[in-house]
Curated annotation (Swiss-Prot):
Domain VHS: 18-148
Stretches assigned to the SH3 domain: 250-309
A GO MF label: ubiquitin binding
Residues covered by region (Disordered): 144-168, 182-247, 432-685
Protein's membrane topology: Peripheral membrane protein
Species of origin: Yarrowia lipolytica (strain CLIB 122 / E 150) (Yeast)
Protein name: Class E vacuolar protein-sorting machinery protein HSE1
Similarity comment text for this entry: Belongs to the STAM family.
Biased amino acid composition, Pro residues: 668-685
Length: 685
C-alpha cells in the first residue's frame, strides 16, 4: 500500500518525550534517558537517534526545535565518537544549515543553531575528520552576523580611581533621590561638573537592540531640548545641556539579558535571553556580579541591557490603570448577577442594551487584568525568593552564633569566682577567698548569698571603720564543707584561724605562751602563696579593739567556764553566765552530729590571737556552758583532743540569740530575739 514519508526509528518515543513542545524547560532526566538508549545499542543507536532528532527539528514548534538542539549537545558529550561522527555527517549538517536559513524559523532558534555549531567546533577542534562542523559555523557566522552573540570581554581589574568614582556616583544618586527641590537645570549642571572631573563610561559596554536604541536616542534628544529650554528660562544657569552619563552599577539595579550565556568558568552566571538579573556590584571593568533565581555570579555587560527605573509620571500612570481595572469590578458582579438570575433564560440577550453594555465594558479590561495578574505574580515570586534568602541568611547567622556561644560562655565561667564580685570586701582583706559560696561570711562580703548580716548596721559600720585602719591581715582559705546551724551563728568580727586538732596546736588547754608561738603561714593579699613565717609576738597592738573598750584590752569575764582559747572566744555566741551550772555532763543521744572533715578543727578548737597582739590583749571570751555537749569546765584540763567530734543536739531552737554587740565583764548580755525559741535551759528541763 502506501509507505510513510518519514522513516520510523525505535527511539522516536524517548526523543519525542524529551523534546515535547509542552515542556516549560529542558528536562534533563528525559535527555539522559535518550543517551542511555543510544549507549545500550552501540551498533545502530547513533543512526537511529539522528533520524529521530531530524524529524523533531523539522517541526514548526520553536520549543521542540530548541529542545532538540539541546539534545544534540548532550548526545555529543555522552555517547562517544560514533555519535560525534553521525552529528558531523553531511546530511545532519545540511539539516542544521537549512534550519538557520529558513525565514519562517524563529530568530531564537537560529541563534541556538549558531550556538550549537560554535560549541561543537570547540569540541571537535582536535579531530580533523569532524571539520565539516567548523566549516558550517564559519559560513553561518559570515552570512548571519546578527545571530552571533558578542565575545566575552576580558576581565580587567577595576582601578582604585574607578572604584572611587563609582562610590561617588552612588553617593550622588542617594543625595539626589532624597532631594526634592532640585530643578532640572541644577541637576544637569551637577552632571556637567561631575563629567568634567571624571571620564564618562563608554556606551559600547552595554548591548542594545535596534528598536530600543532608536527609543533611547529619541529620549536623549528630547532631554537635550528640554534641558536647553530650561537653561534659556533660567538666567542664573549658563551651562549648556549635556547628555546624562551611561548608567553604572551605582544607578542600575536591574539588567535584562539579550543573549543566552552558558557559564564556562567558575563564578560565572548562566542565564537565558529575557532574564532579569539583579545587579549587586561591579567586580571587573566590564563584568558585574548579579543574582538570578537564587544563583550569584558575574556576567559580561555586553550581554545585557540596563532597565531604566520608572519615573514618577510612569508610576502614576500605572496606578491610574490599576484603579480603572478595579473600578470595573462592580460592573462584572452586576453582569454575573443578571446572568445568574432566574429571569436570564427569558431575557432576549441580543435586545437587552444593559447586558450588552455591561458585557462590552468588561471585555475591554480583560487584557489589562491579565497584565496585572502577571505583574503581581512576578512580584510574589520575587518576594518568595527574597524570603528564602532571608531565611537562609538567618539560619546561617543563628548557627554561627550558637557555635560561638560555648566558647565565650566557657571562658566566663572559668574566670569567675563562686564568692561573687570583689568590690564588696572590706579594705585589707582578700575578697575572692574570704567566703566561698554557700558559707556565711563577714558583713559586706558579696560572696555569702542567702545569709543575713549578723550585726546591726551601726556596729557593722564601726567594724568596717576599724578594719580600714588595720593592716592587711590574710585569712585562711576555707574548703567546701557543711556547717551546723549553731556554727553559722558563731561568726566573729575578727579573723579566725582553724587548725586540724592536735596537729595544729597540740592540746585543748594550751597556755598563752603556747598560743604566742603560733605561726601565720598565709601571706600576701592577692593569694600570692606563702611568705616568711611571722611568730605572733606577745607585745604590740597591731590589732585594734572595738571602741566599746576604748582601744584597750577588756577585762576577762567572770564566767566560770570561760576557757582562754575555747570556743567561746571572739565571734562565738554568748549565753548568760551561770545559767547552766547544774547542767549534765553529757548531751542527749538523740541528735548526733557529723564529724568535722579533715583540715578543719572541731568546734572546741581554740582560736588564735590576732596577728601582732598578745594573748592577754585579745578580745574577751564569750562562752557557753556547753560546747558540743561538753561542759566548758572540762576544757581547761589537760585531756588530749581527738579528731572525733562529740555529738550535739541538732535543734535549731537551741541556738543562742545572735550577738547584738560586745559587752565587757560585769555587763548583762542582750535580751534574746523574739520568736527565737526557748532558752537553752528549757531543753534540759
Amino acid at each position: 500500500m502506501f509507505r510513510s514519508s518519514e522513516p520510523v526509528s525505535p527511539l522516536d518515543d524517548v526523543v519525542t518525550k524529551a523534546t515535547d513542545e509542552n515542556l516549560t524547560t529542558e528536562n534533563w532526566q528525559y535527555i539522559l534517558d535518550v543517551c542511555d538508549e543510544v549507549n545500550n545499542d552501540p551498533e545502530n543507536g547513533a543512526k537511529n537517534v539522528i533520524t529521530s532528532v531530524t524529524k523533531r527539528l523539522n517541526k514548526k514548534f520553536a520549543n521542540t526545535q530548541l529542545y532538540a538542539l539541546t539534545l544534540v549537545i548532550s548526545l555529543s558529550s555522552n555517547c562517544g565518537s560514533k555519535m560525534q561522527q553521525a552529528i558531523a555527517s553531511k546530511a545532519f549538517v545540511k539539516t542544521l544549515m537549512k534550519l538557520a536559513n529558513d525565514s519562517a524559523v524563529h530568530k531564537s532558534v537560529k541563534s541556538k543553531v549558531l550556538e550549537v555549531l560554535e560549541q561543537l567546533t570547540d569540541e571537535y577542534k582536535k579531530d580533523p575528520s569532524l571539520r565539516l562542523i567548523e566549516e558550517a559555523y564559519d559560513e553561518l557566522s559570515r552570512k548571519k552576523p546578527d545571530l552571533k552573540a558578542p565575545a566575552k570581554p576580558e576581565k580587567h581589574k577595576i582601578t582604585e580611581q574607578e572604584r572611587q568614582r563609582e562610590e561617588e556616583e552612588l553617593q550622588m544618586v542617594l543625595a539626589l533621590s532624597l532631594s526634592e527641590t532640585n530643578t532640572s537645570g541644577s541637576f544637569q549642571q551637577h552632571h556637567q561638573t561631575n563629567s568634567q572631573i571624571q571620564p564618562p563610561v563608554n556606551n559600547s559596554h552595554f548591548a542594545t537592540d535596534p528598536h530600543q536604541q532608536q527609543q533611547q536616542q529619541q529620549q536623549q534628544h528630547n532631554q537635550q531640548d528640554y534641558g536647553q529650554q530650561s537653561n534659556n528660562a533660567n538666567t542664573n544657569n549658563n551651562a549648556p545641556a549635556v547628555e546624562d552619563p551611561t548608567p553604572t552599577v551605582a544607578t542600575v539595579s536591574r539588567v535584562k539579558a539579550l543573549y543566552d550565556l552558558n557559564a564556562t568558568e567558575p563564578g560565572e552566571l548562566s542565564f537565558r535571553k529575557g532574564d532579569i538579573i539583579t545587579v549587586l556590584e561591579s567586580v571587573f571593568r566590564d563584568w558585574w556580579r548579579g543574582s538570578l533565581r537564587g544563583q550569584v555570579g558575574i556576567f559580561p555587560l555586553n550581554y545585557v541591557m540596563p532597565i531604566a527605573e520608572p519615573t514618577p509620571a510612569e508610576i502614576e500612570k500605572e496606578a491610574q490603570e490599576e484603579l480603572s481595572v478595579f473600578s470595573q469590578s462592580r460592573n462584572i458582579e452586576k453582569l454575573l448577577a443578571l446572568l445568574s438570575s432566574q429571569d436570564a433564560a427569558r431575557l432576549n440577550l441580543a435586545e437587552n442594551e444593559e447586558l450588552q453594555s455591561l458585557y462590552h465594558s468588561t471585555l475591554a479590561i480583560r487584557p489589562k487584568l491579565v497584565k496585572l495578574i502577571d505583574k503581581y505574580a512576578q512580584r510574589k515570586d520575587d518576594l518568595v525568593e527574597l524570603n528564602e534568602k532571608f531565611v537562609k541568611a538567618r539560619r546561617v547567622y543563628d548557627d554561627l552564633m550558637e557555635a560561638s556561644m560555648p566558647q565565650y560562655g566557657g571562658a566566663a565561667a572559668a574566670g569567675g569566682y563562686a564568692g561573687g564580685a570583689q568590690g564588696g570586701a572590706p579594705a585589707g582583706y582578700p575578697s575572692a577567698q574570704g567566703a566561698p559560696a554557700g558559707y556565711p561570711g563577714t558583713s559586706g562580703t558579696p560572696g555569702t548569698p542567702g545569709y543575713p548580716p549578723q550585726y546591726p548596721p551601726q556596729q557593722q559600720q564601726q567594724q568596717q571603720q576599724q578594719q580600714q585602719q588595720q593592716p592587711p591581715y590574710p585569712v585562711q582559705p576555707l574548703q567546701t564543707h557543711q556547717q551546723q546551724p549553731q556554727q553559722q551563728q558563731q561568726q566573729t568580727p575578727y579573723p579566725v584561724h582553724q587548725y586540724d586538732n592536735t596537729q595544729a596546736h597540740g592540746r585543748q588547754g594550751s597556755t598563752d605562751s603556747g598560743r604566742s608561738q603560733r605561726m601565720y603561714s598565709q601571706g600576701g593579699q592577692g593569694g600570692q602563696g606563702p611568705t616568711d613565717l611571722h611568730p605572733a609576738t606577745t607585745g604590740g597592738s597591731g590589732y585594734g579593739f572595738p571602741p566599746q573598750y576604748g582601744g584597750g584590752a577588756p577585762s576577762a569575764p567572770s564566767a566560770p567556764h570561760g576557757g582562754a582559747g575555747g570556743p567561746g572566744g571572739p565571734g562565738g555566741p554568748s549565753a548568760p553566765s551561770g545559767a547552766h551550772s547544774g547542767a549534765p555532763s553529757a548531751p542527749p543521744s538523740h541528735a548526733p552530729a557529723a564529724s568535722a572533715p579533715h583540715g578543719y578543727g572541731s568546734p572546741s578548737t581554740a582560736h588564735s590571737a590576732p596577728y601582732g597582739t598578745s594573748p592577754a590583749a585579745s578580745a574577751p571570751a564569750r562562752h557557753s556552758p556547753y560546747i558540743n555537749g561538753t561542759p566548758t569546765s572540762n576544757l581547761g584540763q589537760q585531756s588530749p583532743v581527738t579528731s572525733q567530734s562529740i555529738p550535739i543536739p541538732n535543734n535549731n531552737n537551741l541556738a543562742a540569740p545572735p550577738v547584738q554587740g560586745l559587752y565587757s565583764h560585769g555587763t548583762s548580755p542582750p535580751p534574746p530575739v523574739p520568736n527565737a525559741g526557748p532558752p537553752p535551759s528549757n531543753f534540759y528541763e
